[in-house]
Amino acid sequence: MQAQGSQSNVGSLRSNCSDNSLPNNHVMMHCDESSGSPHSEHNDYSYEKTNLESTASNSREHRDNQLSRLKSEEYVVPKNQRRGLLPQLAIIPEFKDARDYPPMMKKMIVFLIAFSSMMGPMGTSIIFPAINSITTEFKTSVIMVNVSIGVYLLSLGVFPLWWSSLSELEGRRTTYITSFALLFAFNIGSALAPDINSFIALRMLCGAASASVQSVGAGTVADLYISEDRGKNLSYYYLGPLLAPLLSPIFGSLLVNRWPWRSTQWFMVILSGCNVILLTVLLPETLRKQDSKGAIAQILAERRIQVDNNERGEIQEDYQRGEDETDRIENQVATLSTEKHNYVGEVRDQDSLDLESHSSPNTYDGRAGETQLQRIYTEASRSLYEYQLDDSGIDATTAQVTRIRSTDPKLARSIRENSLRKLQTNLEEQVKKVLSSNGGEIAPKQVSAVRKVWDTFFVYFIKPLKSLHFLEYPPVALAITFSAISFSTVYFVNMTVEYKYSRPPYNFKPLYIGLLYIPNSVTYFFASIYGGRWVDMLLKRYKEKYGILAPEARISWNVVTSVISFPIALLIFGWCLDKKCHWVTPLIGTALFGYAAMMTIGATLSYLVDSLPGKGATGVALNNLIRQILAATAVFVTTPMLNGMGTGWAFTMLAFIVLGASSVLIILKKHGDYWRENYDLQKLYDKID
């Protein structure tokens, strides 16, 4: 009886332990030790071992599939078609779409760009511990040495406008290699400068050369990652320009403690030289052909299409009732377009994914009339498309039509017919104007050399200034305002640390002053890594809840914590120095400051890139322009402000400025979606292009 009972228990145990949900080759007994099975522990181990082996096998297979892309013609651009300067020297192939790179390769490119982005800010701060030595050797004043720092910062802010434009015309790789090769040469000049005037001039050129990555770097990250993964990787990239001002005084103090001040410049020569080699060998071209003007226009059009779905459906029904009459007008417009194509040949599709859709000097070969006609007919096509989908289609080439809505079919049909007639009339007038201005010839056979030189000069030097029009877009202007104010406080803090700790009652040597930047460097690093993940999580959560990606989702509790911490950190730092507290206590303020600054700057940078589809590098260039102007101002006014107001009250004023500026984040959070849906961003893009 006992044996039978035992067999019955075992049978029951087997029945309870079988897992029919597993595949046949993975079915195992998996029971608790209390069940009394002598093989349960062994089976648990076998099950876990099988799972681990399966996971490892899948991981290896996934990695092999990722690496196989490097040799696949489906992903890789042929060697003879690769873009950029010296593409044959790059060991990493160019992909047809930069977002198809394996994850580890994307990370490597991001960290390479982050390393490059350290060059500019490091060149500024590395001479902080050497200011007194430079003053002594050149027999000049501290103010003149500060001028060399200020002009460096100004050029670091102004020149990204041109570098970002060059990167969109010639590609990222060409821009990086050219700029850092120039930086290498100018750093040699700075190390050999015979007097303060030449030193100031060469420092300005160094700032201009190192400025490329300050704007193009964010564009490179946008090339590689979709919006949901962009915040985290932008934070990795932004470690470079934000950690450099904090780490470079440490390097500078170590160098000045052992060698003369010129060693700081020779250190920059070595660093920039290594960077040129790394960029040449490891950086492929990442500028996406998929981000052409046509693709960007499609994205913006889709945004506007989503705004008024219900009304659009009603209007489409009304338009259908009046189809016979309106088709006649549309056919007349289409006939004009056909005649134009017969006259000048086939016009490239504006939605082409070819990189040549970007403007370049080659497009200015005397075919100005043809280009103008292409623009007119492209705008006309877009207007017709908008009229078919939405009654609010307002075109750049036509007189603005009052936005009238009606549920009366006859009135709606009349409004649409009138709008289309205006479009037809304006189109005919503009075509006649272009043809008459060119004497009936669209493509003159010969173009003067002077005109070609002027066109090239315009594209590379004048046209980048048009990017200032982006400041007309409220989300861009507001985000840049807060980002610039936050960034300028970094230089107020850095200059104050060097100024106050080198004087009584502290009297620190340059080596120890450099080490004082460690607390905020640590919190910078922490906030950069986890802050980027935080903003990506917020964006994904918003998409899961509402089904769309909204840049405003990046501004949430992450920014609230930093806005609260920011003024507190400045007050602790300023008043502890003012009251001559123990040297450690002001560093509590700098540590908290590092977290607050990085969290806000990182979130606003991600927001800025997401707000300008396909123009992230240009947006970041504008951001750099404004923030570096304020940073240069901080360099010039910090010492007089500390002497005139006292450290405590000076940083109290800064705390209130930051607190007041944070109100723009509330405005962005509340009204960002309204501007995104109602502002015609495509018109702004057309104005810049």
UniProtKB/Swiss-Prot annotation:
The modification Phosphoserine is found at S436. It comes from the Eukaryota. The keyword Transmembrane applies. The keyword Transmembrane helix applies. The chain crosses the membrane at residues 109-131, 140-163, 176-193, 236-256, 266-283, 476-493, 511-532, 559-577, 587-609, 625-642, 649-668. GO terms for biological process: amino acid export across plasma membrane; ascospore wall assembly; intracellular polyamine homeostasis; transmembrane transport. It holds the Pfam family MFS_1. Residues 29-51, 59-73 have a biased composition (Basic and acidic residues). Signal peptide: none annotated. GO terms for cellular component: cell periphery; plasma membrane. Residues 1-24 have a biased composition (Polar residues). GO terms for molecular function: efflux transmembrane transporter activity; polyamine transmembrane transporter activity; threonine efflux transmembrane transporter activity. Multidrug resistance transporter involved in resistance and adaptation to quinidine and to the herbicide barban (4-chloro-2-butynyl [3-chlorophenyl] carbamate). Present with 279 molecules/cell in log phase SD medium. PANTHER family: MAJOR FACILITATOR SUPERFAMILY, QUINIDINE RESISTANCE PROTEIN 3. Belongs to the major facilitator superfamily. CAR1 family. This is Quinidine resistance protein 3. The gene is QDR3.
